[in-house]
Amino acid sequence: MADAFVGTWKLVDSKNFDDYMKSLGVGFATRQVASMTKPTTIIEKNGDTITIKTHSTFKNTEISFQLGVEFDEVTADDRKVKSVVTLDGGKLVHVQKWDGQETTLTRELSDGKLILTLTHGNVVSTRTYEKEA
Protein backbone atom coordinates (compact mmCIF):
# COMPACT_ATOMS: atom_id res chain seq x y z
CA MET A 1 0.00 0.00 0.00
CA ALA A 2 2.92 2.37 0.67
CA ASP A 3 3.64 2.11 -3.08
CA ALA A 4 0.62 4.33 -3.77
CA PHE A 5 2.44 7.26 -2.11
CA VAL A 6 5.50 6.98 -4.37
CA GLY A 7 6.00 9.98 -6.63
CA THR A 8 6.68 13.70 -6.71
CA TRP A 9 4.10 15.88 -4.98
CA LYS A 10 3.79 19.70 -5.16
CA LEU A 11 2.04 21.75 -2.45
CA VAL A 12 -1.13 23.40 -3.82
CA ASP A 13 -3.04 24.38 -0.66
CA SER A 14 -2.22 24.98 2.99
CA LYS A 15 -4.54 25.66 5.91
CA ASN A 16 -3.54 26.76 9.44
CA PHE A 17 0.18 26.06 8.89
CA ASP A 18 1.30 29.25 10.69
CA ASP A 19 -0.65 28.27 13.82
CA TYR A 20 0.85 24.77 13.67
CA MET A 21 4.40 26.17 13.45
CA LYS A 22 3.63 28.64 16.24
CA SER A 23 2.47 25.77 18.48
CA LEU A 24 5.83 24.06 17.85
CA GLY A 25 7.67 27.21 18.97
CA VAL A 26 8.92 28.23 15.51
CA GLY A 27 9.99 31.90 15.49
CA PHE A 28 8.17 34.66 13.61
CA ALA A 29 10.72 35.20 10.82
CA THR A 30 11.05 31.48 10.09
CA ARG A 31 7.25 31.09 10.05
CA GLN A 32 6.91 33.95 7.56
CA VAL A 33 9.37 32.35 5.13
CA ALA A 34 8.00 28.82 5.62
CA SER A 35 4.41 29.97 5.11
CA MET A 36 5.28 31.47 1.72
CA THR A 37 7.19 28.40 0.53
CA LYS A 38 5.56 25.79 -1.71
CA PRO A 39 7.62 22.65 -1.16
CA THR A 40 7.90 19.59 -3.37
CA THR A 41 7.81 16.23 -1.61
CA ILE A 42 9.41 13.21 -3.28
CA ILE A 43 8.45 9.81 -1.88
CA GLU A 44 10.53 6.79 -2.92
CA LYS A 45 10.42 3.14 -1.90
CA ASN A 46 13.33 0.75 -2.24
CA GLY A 47 12.59 -2.68 -0.78
CA ASP A 48 11.48 -2.10 2.84
CA THR A 49 12.97 1.40 2.98
CA ILE A 50 10.86 4.49 2.32
CA THR A 51 12.55 7.84 1.65
CA ILE A 52 10.73 11.17 1.92
CA LYS A 53 12.57 14.18 0.51
CA THR A 54 11.15 17.67 0.92
CA HIS A 55 12.65 20.37 -1.29
CA SER A 56 11.91 24.09 -1.06
CA THR A 57 13.61 27.46 -1.30
CA PHE A 58 13.48 27.48 2.53
CA LYS A 59 15.09 24.15 3.37
CA ASN A 60 15.68 20.65 2.03
CA THR A 61 15.13 17.63 4.27
CA GLU A 62 15.38 13.89 3.74
CA ILE A 63 14.40 10.96 5.92
CA SER A 64 14.72 7.24 5.22
CA PHE A 65 12.99 4.67 7.36
CA GLN A 66 11.34 1.29 7.60
CA LEU A 67 7.71 1.12 8.69
CA GLY A 68 7.38 0.57 12.45
CA VAL A 69 11.09 1.15 13.20
CA GLU A 70 12.00 4.18 15.34
CA PHE A 71 14.64 6.54 13.92
CA ASP A 72 16.31 9.83 14.81
CA GLU A 73 15.21 12.84 12.77
CA VAL A 74 16.20 16.49 12.60
CA THR A 75 13.15 18.44 11.43
CA ALA A 76 13.07 21.43 9.07
CA ASP A 77 12.81 23.68 12.15
CA ASP A 78 15.85 21.92 13.72
CA ARG A 79 14.02 19.88 16.37
CA LYS A 80 15.82 16.64 17.23
CA VAL A 81 13.06 14.05 17.48
CA LYS A 82 12.47 10.31 17.74
CA SER A 83 10.20 9.31 14.87
CA VAL A 84 8.27 6.26 13.82
CA VAL A 85 6.15 5.87 10.68
CA THR A 86 3.44 3.23 10.37
CA LEU A 87 0.86 2.31 7.74
CA ASP A 88 -2.59 2.50 9.33
CA GLY A 89 -5.72 1.99 7.24
CA GLY A 90 -4.02 3.18 4.06
CA LYS A 91 -2.52 6.23 5.78
CA LEU A 92 1.17 6.88 6.46
CA VAL A 93 1.23 8.00 10.11
CA HIS A 94 4.46 9.73 11.19
CA VAL A 95 4.81 10.43 14.94
CA GLN A 96 7.60 12.71 16.21
CA LYS A 97 8.44 12.81 19.94
CA TRP A 98 10.78 15.24 21.73
CA ASP A 99 11.05 16.87 25.16
CA GLY A 100 7.78 15.32 26.36
CA GLN A 101 5.92 16.59 23.28
CA GLU A 102 4.44 14.79 20.30
CA THR A 103 3.27 15.77 16.84
CA THR A 104 1.63 13.59 14.21
CA LEU A 105 1.98 13.95 10.44
CA THR A 106 -0.61 11.84 8.60
CA ARG A 107 -0.38 11.38 4.83
CA GLU A 108 -3.37 9.98 2.97
CA LEU A 109 -4.49 9.84 -0.65
CA SER A 110 -7.83 11.35 -1.63
CA ASP A 111 -9.08 11.97 -5.18
CA GLY A 112 -5.55 11.67 -6.55
CA LYS A 113 -4.18 14.21 -4.07
CA LEU A 114 -1.89 13.67 -1.10
CA ILE A 115 -3.38 15.20 2.05
CA LEU A 116 -0.90 15.92 4.87
CA THR A 117 -2.56 16.53 8.24
CA LEU A 118 -0.25 17.97 10.90
CA THR A 119 -1.42 17.75 14.53
CA HIS A 120 0.27 19.21 17.64
CA GLY A 121 -1.93 19.29 20.74
CA ASN A 122 -5.25 20.75 19.60
CA VAL A 123 -3.75 22.58 16.59
CA VAL A 124 -4.38 20.97 13.19
CA SER A 125 -2.98 22.06 9.82
CA THR A 126 -3.91 20.53 6.46
CA ARG A 127 -1.61 20.73 3.45
CA THR A 128 -2.72 19.42 0.05
CA TYR A 129 -0.31 18.19 -2.63
CA GLU A 130 -0.91 17.27 -6.26
CA LYS A 131 1.16 14.64 -8.05
CA GLU A 132 3.48 15.90 -10.77
CA ALA A 133 3.40 14.11 -14.11
Swiss-Prot record:
Gene3D superfamilies: 2.40.128.20. The keyword Metal-binding does not apply. Octadecanoate binds at residues 127-129. Forms a beta-barrel structure that accommodates the hydrophobic ligand in its interior. FABPs are thought to play a role in the intracellular transport of long-chain fatty acids and their acyl-CoA esters. Keywords: Acetylation, Cytoplasm, Lipid-binding, Phosphoprotein, Transport. The lineage of its organism: Eukaryota, Metazoa, Chordata, Craniata, Vertebrata. Hexadecanoate binds at residues 127-129. Heart, but also skeletal muscle, kidney, brain and mammary gland. The gene is Fabp3. This is Fatty acid-binding protein, heart. GO terms for cellular component: cytosol; extracellular space; nucleus; sarcoplasm. It holds the Pfam family Lipocalin.
